């Protein structure tokens, strides 16, 4: 097999698994990165994200975009889609969702760098955008410099997911 089913070991994945809305969201699928020697960015955008406001119970809609530089593993896109759909009936703040997605992907993939952008549609006249990112700890200095340069270059490019 060129990919493996890997359970998320983080507490963030466990939180989702204990919500018991009938869907298995504690597993994401990953496959080996064929180019671990080269820092490159993978960007996945999910424009149909929905969850529920924990205060009002009203739906929150938006786009979740994940950008990461893989190390040994890459996330499989169908499993990511199913993971995103699992939030549909989950009540949580937008800031919490964005950070939980980051931590779940870090636990699964251990990427060199990962950023999650939660671009939520306005509700009550207020638009909320949440950005959370992290670099892998303990990278050799040369690799870290190359990864940071790749990230800097990537961030200077126009957003590929905006029309």
Explain the meaning of each model-derived region.
Residues 2-163:
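N-terminal intrinsically disordered, cationic/polar leader segments
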């Amino acid at each position: 097999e060129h990919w493996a089913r890997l359970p998320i070991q983080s507490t963030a994945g466990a939180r989702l698994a204990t919500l018991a809305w009938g869907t298995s969201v504690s597993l994401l699928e990953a496959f080996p990165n064929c180019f671990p020697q080269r820092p490159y960015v993978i960007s996945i955008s999910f424009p149909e994200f929905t969850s529920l406001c924990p205060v009002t119970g009203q739906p929150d809609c938006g786009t979740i975009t994940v950008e990461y530089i893989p190390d040994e593993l890459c996330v499989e896109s169908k499993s990511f889609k199913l993971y995103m759909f699992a939030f549909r009936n989950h009540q949580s703040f937008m800031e919490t969702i964005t950070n939980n997605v980051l931590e779940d992907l870090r636990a699964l993939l251990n990427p060199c760098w990962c950023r999650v952008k939660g671009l939520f549609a306005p509700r009550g006249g207020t638009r909320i955008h949440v950005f959370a990112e992290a670099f892998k700890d303990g990278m050799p200095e040369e690799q870290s410099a190359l990864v940071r340069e790749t990230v800097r270059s990537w961030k200077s490019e126009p957003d590929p997911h905006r029309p």
